[in-house]
Amino acid sequence: RAAGEVFNITNGDFFRWRHVWPKIADLFGMEAAGVEPRTLVDWMQEANSLWDELIARHDLEPNPLEDLVSWRFADYVFGTTWDVMASTFKCRRAGFLEFVDSEQVLLERLAELRTLKIVP
């Protein structure tokens, strides 16, 4: 039923970053800050030296920051000013019925990155 078909690849649930940031901050033992509109591409240009300090301070794996993140993609994801909605009807009708809680999985993956010493 799915051969030759094109599907929206989305989990189907909706979340807003403003609701997720406090949970991410809590995971890292931090207070969530307010909104500061800026592009990460510009803001993070000077982040490599800070990242090197964090690697040393927290005994992290020595991964260069540019190997871990695309600031252009992050700007796109975090800067979207509309709710992203994509129908999952077609893929469910074709039998793809599994789903996950996107917020929960995000927090689990971030916790896993901490365990692997990728992030502090």
Predicted regions and their residues:
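A conserved mid-domain beta-alpha-beta active-site/ligand-binding segment of alpha/beta enzyme cores
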Residues: 74-78
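Conserved beta-strand edge residues that scaffold enzyme active sites
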Residues: 99, 105-106
